[in-house]
């Protein structure tokens, strides 16, 4: 079967990605209205309720009647990862197709987008609670950087991709190596080589660096004026800690530090 025939059999999907403040949100809405699409957020922080200012979350009135998926679906004390995103995004895409619409994936979390596009198999190994507890205790006693250096020794690619403060992900990568003797980064890379089940169009937005920096600085000023510090305090009161997944977003962890 030729490439054109294969593409014709696949369902269409559009991806809009790019750096912060480049204009993904506005363009995604314009495009959705023009082609009859619905938007799937690929932002790892906008899934959380009560985190509106620091995530620059789109407001209801800004959606302009376009349905948005994977926004405000979890409490900030809940974990969210690529496996969960993949399952939810797949379901959202099928829901959109069922109405004869086209999914538009918008956001800046590249690994999440790849997980959806290439149907990556995140093999779930048996949990080793003893190992996890040992790693958690090590992080608590000696600091997150100790675990991160341990990961760097066995899987430098994963260490490069995972921030040291994201202790849960660091431990999962170490656990995968402990259980299988293989690097989880190698497993994920092999999965990314798969053929996509979608006929997708992938657009990376960009603009002049000076303009982009000016927009980012303006956005930060607006966030502070709108009450970002108070938002973080409220999240702390709800039980969010420095190592909570929801607190790994830019702005939140800096204020907590």
Listing of model-derived features with the role each one plays in the protein:
Residues 1-257:
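Phosphate/pyrophosphate-binding catalytic cores of soluble transferases and nucleic-acid-acting enzymes
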């Amino acid at each position: 079967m030729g490439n054109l025939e294969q593409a014709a059999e696949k369902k269409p999907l559009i991806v809009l990605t790019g750096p912060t403040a480049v204009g993904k949100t506005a363009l995604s809405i314009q495009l959705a209205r023009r082609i009859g699409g619905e938007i799937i957020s690929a932002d790892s922080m906008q899934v959380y309720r009560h985190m509106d200012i620091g995530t620059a979350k789109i407001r209801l009135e800004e959606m302009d009647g376009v349905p948005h998926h994977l926004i405000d679906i979890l409490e900030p004390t809940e974990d969210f990862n690529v496996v969960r995103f993949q399952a939810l995004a797949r379901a959202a895409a099928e829901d959109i197709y069922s109405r004869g619409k086209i999914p538009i994936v918008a956001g800046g979390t590249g690994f999440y987008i790849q997980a959806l596009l290439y149907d990556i198999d995140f093999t779930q190994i048996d949990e080793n609670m003893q190992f996890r507890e040992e790693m958690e205790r090590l992080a608590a006693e000696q600091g997150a950087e100790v675990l991160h250096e341990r990961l760097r020794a066995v899987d430098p690619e994963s260490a490069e991709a995972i921030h040291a403060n994201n202790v849960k992900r660091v431990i999962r990568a170490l656990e995968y190596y402990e259980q299988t003797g293989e690097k989880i980064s190698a497993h994920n890379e092999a999965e990314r080589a798969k053929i996509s089940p979608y006929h997708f169009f992938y657009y990376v937005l960009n603009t002049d660096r000076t303009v982009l920096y000016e927009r980012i600085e303006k956005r930060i000023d607006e966030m502070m004026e709108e009450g970002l510090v108070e938002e973080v305090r409220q999240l702390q009161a709800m039980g969010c800690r420095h190592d909570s997944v929801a607190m790994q977003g830019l702005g939140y962890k800096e204020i907590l530090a």
